From Swiss-Prot:
The reaction(s) this protein catalyses: a (3S)-3-hydroxyacyl-CoA = a (2E)-enoyl-CoA + H2O; a 4-saturated-(3S)-3-hydroxyacyl-CoA = a (3E)-enoyl-CoA + H2O; a (3S)-3-hydroxyacyl-CoA + NAD(+) = a 3-oxoacyl-CoA + NADH + H(+); (3S)-3-hydroxybutanoyl-CoA = (3R)-3-hydroxybutanoyl-CoA
Keywords, sorted A to Z: Cytoplasm, Fatty acid metabolism, Isomerase, Lipid degradation, Lipid metabolism, Lyase, Multifunctional enzyme, NAD, Oxidoreductase
Family note: In the N-terminal section; belongs to the enoyl-CoA hydratase/isomerase family. In the central section; belongs to the 3-hydroxyacyl-CoA dehydrogenase family.
Keyword Lyase: yes
EC number from the UniProt entry: 4.2.1.17, 5.1.2.3, 1.1.1.35
Pathway(s) where this gene product acts: Lipid metabolism; fatty acid beta-oxidation
Record-linked InterPro entries: 3-OHacyl-CoA_DH_CS, 3-OHacyl-CoA_DH_NAD-bd, 3HC_DH_C, 6-PGluconate_DH-like_C_sf, ClpP/crotonase-like_dom_sf, Enoyl-CoA_hydra/iso, FA_oxidation_alpha_subunit, FadJ
The protein, known as: Fatty acid oxidation complex subunit alpha
PROSITE patterns associated with the record: 3HCDH
GO MF terms held by the record: 3-hydroxybutyryl-CoA epimerase activity; enoyl-CoA hydratase activity; long-chain-3-hydroxyacyl-CoA dehydrogenase activity; NAD+ binding
Site (Important for catalytic activity): E118, E140
Subunit structure: Heterotetramer of two alpha chains (FadJ) and two beta chains (FadI).
Region Enoyl-CoA hydratase, annotated ranges: 1-190
Amino acid sequence: MEMASAFTLNVRLDNIAIITIDVPGEKMNTLKAEFASQVRAIIKQIRENKELRGVVFVSAKPDNFIAGADINMIGNCKTAQEAEVLARQGQQLMAEIHALPIPVIAAIHGACLGGGLELALACHGRVCTDDPKTVLGLPEVQLGLLPGSGGTQRLPRLIGVSTALEMILTGKQLRAKQAVKLGLVDDVVPHSILLEAAVELAKQDRPSSRPLPVRERILAGPLGRALLFKMVGKKTEHKTQGNYPATERILEVVETGLAQGTSSGYDAEARAFGELAMTPQSQALRNIFFASSEVKKDPGSDAPPAPLNSVGILGGGLMGGGIAYVTACKAGLPVRIKDINPRGINHALKYSWDQLEGKVRRRHLKASERDKQLALISGTTDYCGFAHRDLIIEAVFENLELKQQMVAEVEQNCATHTIFASNTSSLPIGDIAAHAARPEQVIGLHFFSPVEKMPLVEIIPHASTSAQTIATTVKLAKKQGKTPIVVRDKAGFYVNRILAPYINEAIRMLTEGERIEHIDAALVKFGFPVGPIQLLDEVGIDTGTKIMPVLEAAYGERFSAPANVVSSILNDDRKGRKNGRGFYLYGQKGRKSKKQVDPAIYPLIGAQGQGRLSAPQVAERCVMLMLNEAVRCLDEQVIRSVRDGDIGAVFGIGFPPFLGGPFRYIDSLGAGEVVAIMQRLATQYGSRFTPCDRLVEMSERGESFWKTTATDLQ
């Protein structure tokens, strides 16, 4: 039986050809190599029909135009030459679309990304909807690649080189109003008239290119170009620390096209695409993409989730306010916040107002939509309005007795089916549920701060949590736009447990005389978004260190922090950015004017000696402890798989994505090399570096955590 076509041609009575994109059996349109013959057959029909006046590409999917190319095509390439051929085939197809003698218009609704935008760029004009779902971008850099079907050449000529570089180097996605302002699209219309607007444009002569702003024209010239690429190159190097080769190749390819012409530019683009596809960085980033996609499809348990119609939140603090925001504004669920103090409720409501008002100011959201979303959030100082809530998220202080009291109150004031989810970061869920009448409906739901930005949540069932409670909580997390991993109810869960020894070691190096800025710079160079000391300042020194005694009590000496250091810092009223006193100096209202270390910190913690470690040595000490603890978590079934372990570290603490996560990084080094490094460090610095049994066994057997395929585990 012949497979249904992803591209179909229909000719209207007014002689406008409509090419409908609808990949069979898929929610999202993605471009695959086998579609090229379908498109070429349509192009042939269009060329043969001399009556046609214009062509419109439109998607049949409800919320996407084309979300990009199928990444599996790249994974199937065994050599750089094969990947280069793939890029050249894409370039050729786009060139054939662009060469059609009649106007070709892209009618865009929903995601128009990667290869989808490259197809739209090959058209002569573009119309998009004003819907919030409509975004346009070239996110290939986030996979360690560059646009390979002409995007690096067409985009700079359409919107200007500096604007195009910003889009390509960051993967930035534009909304409709931004796109039309920059000249990326010709018109923005309501969804209801998208097709007709595109048809009207197709009936006219080919849309003429909008003149570029004077600034962009100057930057495209030889002198402006030299200055621009030097400046952008420096900025990019500082941001990536040289860890992402794709950014360097993007600059090279775009500059080649501008200096030597499009023919040389396309050639450079295809070669760079092929070479980047084979880099370990791209392979790791693509593996993270696949693992993330799998996690988002994982229901958490085999049981069907219960209905979710409304949510309650206990506590209107920073976490409670953030959770209310993602529940109402991302999940679209009515939220009722309970706080003992009206000020807490006001704080939570203001939090959502500030987030939404910011979107209105940036023209990402209409004021009417802001008001509609805010109307989903209400507050109370008692349990009025909680009787029929399906799930309650507790976000009160980290106090076991208080949380147990919250369980009792929810069971007394809510329905018998109501799930109680605790946002604890350190307390065992089994202890929180110890006196519950319905312990099967108690679970942990650990968000990370700031809630609206951090993509990960840990879902923590205790021994008696039901499968349906797990599935329902996973369902909620996904609705909130989060990536959930299910972890075992052990001290520190997963993310905080692997983070603690990493931070402890940084503090220990401080006491040995290493400078704060040297330690942080070393870990940023390694690939973390911020260093461990700055991270403590950002999350709050009191908050970040509160779990340390819990972990030391559970796992022993390897989690012990340097004696009296943390207490000395806290006793000096240093909580980090939030109170303007931490390891770093802060300006008014806790804002940093320029990041500078507070020199008073060194005598305060009793730092001894002069630091002599190189940046790689500093990073090695912190990272090896994190890797070792991640393997212990896998061994103890704290995490269900190495997939979850890698996703948890990358999305939860910013483990360098280009390394693929702790387990992929161990595989890239080899278990034998990791064991050898740790044994050397154990000899130098103590038994906390002793490699765990599983690593030693894997080293002896030559085993790895991941198979060579993109997503399968051993």
